[in-house]
């Protein structure tokens, strides 16, 4: 099993490798789901729509990326977007040399203006290090070569952060910026992203947190934004000792992360349960400190499997305030410049393929968005809700998706092991014979791949072909079905498939 460190070290090679999908499944296995329309068990917090990830800040200036963001907002209810590198030298924030004594926030404004104009707020990742403040010249091995060294002076870093925050308040107003989140750095426990030590990061966090609160006590700051849920006890202990604010705790988990590192035991959980188990562990670590009850943000995770997305979100509901899937768009150039719009096997990180083409992961979020705000009791693979019109429930057929890295975007092959299932959904409290609407997403329905293959799998589809592919990948109109006399609906779901059942009262 690869882990995040190995992924980063072998990223370019993994991207260059050929990819394919192989699916193995048997026919006809049954799954039982029961939903009680009469039993409201509390609020259903839409933790999945609070944030999603993206590439670097400068990529957000592109029309194609902004079109993807706008679509995400309009069709999935996305509230915030997180991206790297708001301080990167490619935005000219503070390169040093002949560029003046003060920071330049012109391009920062263009980035945030573009996000806010589309009805989305930024989740502000404070990264990476402006050249003027850097203690060295170590660069991130991405296409944009950001400086990943600690600040030469934590005090100067703090003054810079204070000036940055004051500028944001001057431009957007305190009431707006108080709704944002300020996350200090990205994965500082990986040498790929930070050349300093844990102590260097803690000093950097202290300076940033004190600077932000020095401008406005109502602004929200948190961290440590580590990979694989590392440094939690140490970070929270340091902050408690130094009496520092931690308004939220953030970390990243991928299903393929090293379980020995995560849990102290290799292969303790199947892929599907790694993320929920890690979130339960982090929640327990937080609540053992003075920061008990602090919001837990899973500010990076990912899956390209519809059923896996539904399963992970459903099982993280008790622990997380927000889950930010990486990432919204295949306008994405961290390791290299993609030479494809679609491809077999691993299709990249983006839930929207290039040219605004929806993928099954995006369409899964569209279905999640149609769930209501009250949760209904359910057993089996289901997330059920009460809506203004009646009820909506997402059901799924979970399969094991095996990729070397455990995440989309870095895998040379994609192997799916699962069974096609007849999912029998009993709706307790529904009128026998009632009409329901059913919408499906899997690797064939709500997917661009069937039409792309039909067109000959072109590497560079023509404009007319792109339009055909995009139309083919849209969610189909709901299928109208009737419950049987026992209030049961039987669905035929392939491995990875999800279905949204909607019932009018």
Language model features: what each stretch is:
Residues 136-147, 187-189, 251, 255-263:
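A short small-residue
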Residues 87, 128-130, 186-190, 225-229, ...:
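Active-site-proximal loop/turn and secondary-structure-junction residues that shape catalytic pockets
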Residues 342-349:
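Active-site loop ensemble at the mouth of alpha/beta enzyme cores that anchors a bound cofactor
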Residues 131-134, 259-260, 329-339:
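Flexible glycine/acidic-rich beta-alpha junction loops that bind and position SAM and/or redox cofactors
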Residues 198-323:
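Noncatalytic carbohydrate-binding groove/subsite architecture in carbohydrate-active enzymes
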Residues 97-98, 194, 261-269, 336-341, ...:
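Short, flexible/disordered intra-domain loops and linkers
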Residues 8-20, 25-181, 199-228, 288-293, ...:
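Non-catalytic accessory regions flanking glycosidase/transglycosidase catalytic cores in CAZymes
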Residues 1-2:
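Secretory targeting signals
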């Amino acid at each position: 099993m690869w882990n995040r460190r190995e992924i980063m070290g072998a990223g370019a090679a993994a991207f260059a490798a050929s990819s394919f999908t192989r699916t193995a499944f048997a026919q006809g296995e049954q799954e039982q789901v029961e939903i009680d329309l009469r039993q409201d068990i509390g609020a259903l917090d839409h933790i999945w729509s609070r944030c999603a990830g993206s590439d670097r800040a400068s990529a957000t200036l592109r029309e194609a990326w902004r079109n993807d963001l706008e679509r995400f907002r309009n069709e999935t209810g996305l509230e915030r977007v997180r991206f790297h590198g708001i301080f990167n030298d490619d935005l000219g924030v503070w390169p040093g040399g002949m560029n003046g004594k003060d920071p330049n926030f012109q391009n920062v404004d263009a980035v945030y203006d573009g996000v806010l104009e589309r009805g989305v707020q930024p989740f502000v990742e404070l990264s990476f290090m402006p050249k003027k403040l850097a203690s060295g010249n170590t660069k991130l091995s991405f296409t944009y070569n950001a400086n990943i060294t600690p600040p030469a002076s934590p005090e100067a870093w703090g003054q810079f952060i204070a000036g940055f925050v004051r500028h944001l308040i001057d431009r957007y107003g305190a009431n707006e910026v108080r709704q944002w989140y300020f996350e200090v750095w990205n994965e500082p426990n990986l040498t790929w992203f930070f050349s300093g030590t844990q102590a260097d990061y803690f000093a950097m966090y202290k300076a940033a947190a004190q600077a932000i609160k020095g401008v406005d006590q109502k602004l929200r700051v948190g961290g440590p934004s580590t990979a694989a849920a590392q440094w939690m006890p140490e970070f929270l202990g340091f902050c408690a000792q130094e009496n520092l604010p931690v308004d939220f705790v953030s970390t990243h988990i991928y299903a393929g992360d090293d379980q020995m590192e995560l849990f102290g035991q290799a292969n303790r959980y199947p892929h599907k349960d790694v993320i929920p188990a890690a979130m339960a562990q982090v929640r327990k670590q937080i609540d053992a400190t003075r920061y008990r009850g602090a919001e837990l943000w899973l500010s990076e995770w990912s899956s390209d499997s519809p059923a896996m997305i539904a399963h992970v979100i459903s099982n993280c509901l008790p622990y997380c305030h927000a889950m930010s899937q990486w990432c919204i768009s295949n306008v994405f150039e961290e390791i290299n410049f993609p030479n494809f719009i679609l491809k077999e096997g691993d299709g990249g990180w983006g839930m929207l393929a290039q040219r605004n083409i929806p993928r099954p992961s995006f369409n899964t979020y569209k279905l999640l968005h149609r769930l209501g705000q009250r949760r209904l009791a359910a057993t089996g693979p289901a997330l059920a809700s009460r809506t203004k019109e009646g009820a909506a429930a997402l059901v799924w057929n979970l399969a094991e998706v095996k990729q070397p890295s455990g995440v989309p975007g870095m895998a040379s092959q994609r192997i799916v092991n699962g069974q096609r299932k007849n999912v029998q959904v009993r709706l307790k409290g529904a009128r026998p014979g009632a009409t329901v609407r059913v919408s499906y997403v899997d690797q064939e329905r709500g997917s661009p791949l069937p039409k792309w293959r039909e067109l000959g799998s072109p590497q560079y589809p023509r404009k007319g072909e792109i339009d055909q592919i995009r139309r083919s990948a849209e969610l189909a109109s709901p299928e109208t079905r009737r419950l049987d006399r026992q209030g049961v609906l039987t669905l035929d779901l392939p491995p990875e498939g999800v279905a949204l059942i909607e019932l009018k009262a």
